[in-house]
């Protein structure tokens, strides 16, 4: 687990980090979730929005791409539900000066050629190394990344993304992030 200070330092020095909810980042979120759980309001759109967007606001981000999953492998089962949630999240986030767009992705089948946490991590690493890129996963990665680049004013998004993957820089950045979190890809995966 990464502390809030380590997270900030990693973002400052390396430009990338990940962090989960903790006592410093949206401490009320776990309490809101437990209330949703005992009051049968897990599916409450306003509470879902409050949970997700409060963390994003606390992180201090300026732009956000939300990937709303829909289908039998997702929380949102219908396209209508996914659009309703996407619009609610986007409206709230934009009202807080976070430039936000959402996309909807189909979870009625796996995105890649494998499923299961370890297998999906392995596939993600292979993707970043440009060793194996399954079509559906490739399309979703390009859609999310091009939307994110567009939100920041970047042009030639497809070219930037392809270059990051084919040059190995996407994997190198991922590897730096893993190391900054005290992980070791060489010992853990893909020997």
Which stretches of residues belong to each language-model region?
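Well-ordered secondary-structure scaffolds
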Residues: 12-14, 41-44, 48, 55-191
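Phosphate/pyrophosphate-binding betaalpha-module
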Residues: 1-59
